């Protein structure tokens, strides 16, 4: 489609910066994406009373999202490679916005499960689209920063949601919170459709900016022809990426799904009181994750190899998560700081991985690899919410109550990144571009 068949450049002369407008669009789409995901978690205490579901049932509803999310990650990876980023993201966002709004039409655990299946089906196209867009629109040295900017939407969404969802639910009812989230997606499409194209085709990109974008993208010579999806599994780099995502992606889902419940069950804070804690957590995460995104790019600009810079970042981010179990034994605001640091480390880790995918595979394969990795992460996310819900139900009647369950879960979250680092390093000691047939 248009990303793969450039037409002659428009001839604009001054140095433009339109690539940053593109990454801003990706940022806002990611923020909307995460608002849609988080609304259910924020309304859980209210829906607990209305629906009478158990923690395990709530976990199953969220696992339903992960099932279709895992499948659609791969489907959209293929679809985006075939039809282009613009069309692929348009279809993805249309599907998930309709599904988000449909949550406001249901009134049972089964109804929410069906709505979550639809949401997962649409949202699987988001990150493959973003990763491939960054690969097309940014030179290597800027990709990590660009990825950290769009991925920071995963923090901004959860900052905005606790601040506005409780108010909407109180004034207009909880159903309207879901409906308005769906409307926001269609508003974003009104900007995406007229402004997005490949940089070679964009009338908003000047010749100097286009030269800058293409300056070190020598993998274009390795980017002709279709992607052999099964063939990707022959590369150790693919396995390194997908296993790392399988281990660490479920941790991000855990925070998103269970944090409002954590503050309610362990601190007695309902959403009208805990929203400020949640906003602060994601604000900390946003600021520090942008710093993390800058950090590895800074090392590369100082002359470090991509391998050395990205692996240094990965191990530092992994170590930052280790103290998070102390949140169970600390004051509410110390817990906020520890969880915020852990979330920032996760998002810095994640943006590092997105940049690694862009560095190690030619652009024609980036969306496919991102899709495979996203599927692996979502498969991990299928099981972890059910396990978390089951564990919390089992601990409910013990002496420590659900706090004991959360202590175990926080312990799992703290150690998995170190394990993932060594798995990744064993399979991919160096991040060098794969030469594909």
List each language-model region with its residue ranges.
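Multi-pass alpha-helical transporter architecture, strongest
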Residues: 188-196, 324-329, 411-437
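Residue-level signature of mid-helix packing/kink "hotspots" within the transmembrane helices
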Residues: 38, 66-74, 124, 158-159, ...
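Conserved MFS/SLC helix-loop-helix module at the cytosolic interface between two early adjacent transmembrane helices
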Residues: 71-110
């Amino acid at each position: 489609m248009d990303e793969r068949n450039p037409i002659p450049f428009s001839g604009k002369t001054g140095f433009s910066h339109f690539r940053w407008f593109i990454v801003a669009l990706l940022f806002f789409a990611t923020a909307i994406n995460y608002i849609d995901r988080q609304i259910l978690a924020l309304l859980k205490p209210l829906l607990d009373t209305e629906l009478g579901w158990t923690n395990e049932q709530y976990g199953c509803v969220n696992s339903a999202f992960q099932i279709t999310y895992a499948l659609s990650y791969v489907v959209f990876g293929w679809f985006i490679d075939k039809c282009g980023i613009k069309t692929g993201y348009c279809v993805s966002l249309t599907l998930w916005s309709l599904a988000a709004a449909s949550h406001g039409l249901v009134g049972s655990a089964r109804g929410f499960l069906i709505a979550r299946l639809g949401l997962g089906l649409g949202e699987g196209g988001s990150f493959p689209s973003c990763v491939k867009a960054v690969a097309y629109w940014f030179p290597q040295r800027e990709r990590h920063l660009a990825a950290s900017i769009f991925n920071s939407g995963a923090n901004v969404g959860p900052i905005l949601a606790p601040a506005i969802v409780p108010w909407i639910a109180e004034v207009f009812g909880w159903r309207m919170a879901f409906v308005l989230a769906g409307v926001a997606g269609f508003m974003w499409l009104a900007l995406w459709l007229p402004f997005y194209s490949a940089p070679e085709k964009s009338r908003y990109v000047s010749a100097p900016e286009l030269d800058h974008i293409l300056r070190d993208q020598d993998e274009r010579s390795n980017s002709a022809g279709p992607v052999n999806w099964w063939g990707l599994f022959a590369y150790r780099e693919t396995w390194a990426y997908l296993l790392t995502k399988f281990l660490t992606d479920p941790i991000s889902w855990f925070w998103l799904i269970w944090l409002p419940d954590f503050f309610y069950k362990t601190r007695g804070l309902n959403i009208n009181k805990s929203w400020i804690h949640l906003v602060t957590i994601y604000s900390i995460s946003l600021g520090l994750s942008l710093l993390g995104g800058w950090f590895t790019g800074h090392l590369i600009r100082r002359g470090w190899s991509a391998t050395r810079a990205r692996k240094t970042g990965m191990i530092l981010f992994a170590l930052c998560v280790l103290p998070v179990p102390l949140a169970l034994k600390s004051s509410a605001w110390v817990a906020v700081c520890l969880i915020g640091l852990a979330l920032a480390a996760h998002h810095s880790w994640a943006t590092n991985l997105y940049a690694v995918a862009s560095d190690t595979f030619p652009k024609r394969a980036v969306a496919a690899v991102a899709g495979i990795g996203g599927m692996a992460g979502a498969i991990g996310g299928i099981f972890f919410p059910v396990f978390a819900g089951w564990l919390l139900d089992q601990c409910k009647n013990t002496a420590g109550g659900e706090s004991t369950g959360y202590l175990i879960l926080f312990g799992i979250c703290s150690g998995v990144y170190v394990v993932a680092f060594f798995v990744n390093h064993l399979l991919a000691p160096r991040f060098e571009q794969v030469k594909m047939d």
